[in-house]
Amino acid sequence: MKKIGVLAIQGAVDEHIQMIESAGALAFKVKHSSDLDGLDGLVLPGGESTTMRKIMKRYDLMEPIRAFASEGKAIFGTCAGLVLLSKEIEGGEESLGLIEATAIRNGFGRQKESFEAELNVEAFGEPAFEAIFIRAPYLIEPSNEVAVLATVENRIVAAKQANILVTAFHPELTNDNRWMNYFLEKMV
């Protein structure tokens, strides 16, 4: 059975754990670099990316997560996870640099501009995925190595590159497990 960690420093950790378990994998909370040992994949949940980065640096998680990815292990970042995984963050904040694109934080606006949207995802077919966007980022300037999986208003809101999957929205806040299934079946 696949073992998936969830970075447990902020965000919808329990919701990701429930989604992982409902998709048939084992879920574990990751708070220290040693917690990455033996995992097949890792989820970076939403939250506030600047705060998450500061906590990750304080607990010396940045380099171990980069090493985890360089071993070919899969990482799925949602919302702030997308921001942290991007090669660059608009404004120059440090990132993990694991997907070749630039993240625009709060790209759709602040909390009051949060919204839901139907996404047509070719890999899923019908019905459309009902995505929840909360202070959502998006990606710009992807390299040719990045596959765009979904857009809203011509803005990239889901993408993958090699073993890295990112969404600007929160699939863990829905009852639709297709993104986690995709991660487990195609990436891990």
Swiss-Prot record:
Tell me which residues this entry annotates as catalytic.
Answer: 79, 170, 172
Q: Which UniProt keywords apply?
A: Glutamine amidotransferase, Hydrolase, Lyase, Pyridoxal phosphate
Any one cellular-component term (Gene Ontology): cytosol
EC id: 4.3.3.6, 3.5.1.2
Could you tell me which pathway this protein works in?
Answer: Cofactor biosynthesis; pyridoxal 5'-phosphate biosynthesis
- Residues reported to bind L-glutamine: 47-49, 105, 134-135
Keyword Lyase listed: yes
Q: Name one GO molecular function term.
A: pyridoxal 5'-phosphate synthase (glutamine hydrolysing) activity
Q: What does this protein do?
A: Catalyzes the hydrolysis of glutamine to glutamate and ammonia as part of the biosynthesis of pyridoxal 5'-phosphate. The resulting ammonia molecule is channeled to the active site of PdxS.
- Stated name of the protein: Pyridoxal 5'-phosphate synthase subunit PdxT
The scientific name of the source species is Listeria monocytogenes serotype 4b (strain F2365)
Gene that encodes the chain: pdxT
